[in-house]
């Protein structure tokens, strides 16, 4: 990710909130395999744990999710873990880092017509795209042995907390659906067909590319342009452009 200073977000808490608000991440791995592609990606909803460190500061956090065992990416992960364990390394953590990318709720093309100051003055404007994103790098831990109590405990906790997060934070239900509402035998069967993944975040980076690099007149034009679209996405982006512009001006 290109982290131009004017767009980069350095506050871990803000990036973590972006992840919590938009938990569907894209997991990307690069695993050498005779059977599967080197680079693979999958959309996975995550739970983010972010405990405080020993000095009271906020940790980068840990991402927890699950994947279908039939997913080729999951098969490559299992293959890599098996090869590692056959060499005497009993850890469930793979040595190579992975990447998870999270996108903000809205992104949009920005037409040069929005630049109401520079376009009529010089014409030196080009289109761009506004968006927000966070990327997390870290080592991945694989829970794939359905005969292991550790794996089944991890999966049970993960699916329960992911369901609760989605039912309450996304759906806003006061009486959310719970995993316990489904037959135990059915849940146990499904658990045997998924793997758990846990990623300890070593580096958390992100950006809000929201026209901060433009002057006040052009930013005002961008805000008006998005508001005049009359869409939820337009209204949301207009608000973020305004907010991020004010933050830049205060620095």
From Swiss-Prot:
Lineage, opening ranks: Eukaryota, Fungi, Dikarya, Ascomycota, Pezizomycotina
Superkingdom assignment: Eukaryota
Protein name: Uncharacterized protein AN0679
One Pfam family named in its UniProt record: FMN_bind_2
Family: Belongs to the PaiB family.
InterPro entries, A to Z: Split_barrel_FMN-bd, TR_PAI2-type
């Amino acid at each position: 990710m290109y982290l131009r200073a004017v767009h980069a977000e350095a506050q871990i808490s803000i990036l973590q909130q972006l992840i919590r608000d938009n938990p569907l991440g894209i997991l990307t791995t690069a695993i050498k395999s005779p059977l599967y592609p080197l680079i693979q990606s999958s959309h996975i909803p995550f739970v983010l744990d972010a405990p405080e460190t020993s000095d009271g500061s906020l940790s980068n956090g840990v991402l927890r999710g699950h994947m279908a065992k039939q997913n080729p990416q999951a098969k490559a992960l299992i293959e890599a873990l098996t090869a590692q364990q056959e060499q005497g390394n009993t850890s469930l953590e793979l040595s190579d880092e992975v990447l998870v990318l999270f996108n903000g709720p809205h992104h949009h093309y920005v037409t040069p017509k929005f630049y109401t100051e520079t376009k009529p003055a010089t014409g030196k404007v080009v289109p761009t795209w506004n968006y927000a994103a966070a990327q997390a790098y870290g080592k991945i831990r694989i829970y794939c042995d359905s005969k292991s109590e550790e794996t089944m405990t991890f999966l049970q906790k993960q699916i329960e907390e992911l369901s609760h997060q989605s039912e309450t934070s996304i759906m806003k239900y006061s009486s959310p659906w719970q995993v316990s509402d489904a037959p135990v035998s059915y849940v146990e069967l499904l658990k045997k067909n998924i793997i758990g993944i846990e990623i300890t975040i070593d580096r958390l980076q992100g950006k809000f590319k929201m026209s901060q690099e433009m002057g006040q007149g052009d930013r005002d034009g961008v805000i008006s342009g998005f508001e005049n679209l009359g869409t939820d996405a337009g209204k949301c982006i207009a608000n973020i452009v305004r907010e991020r512009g004010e933050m830049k001006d205060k620095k």
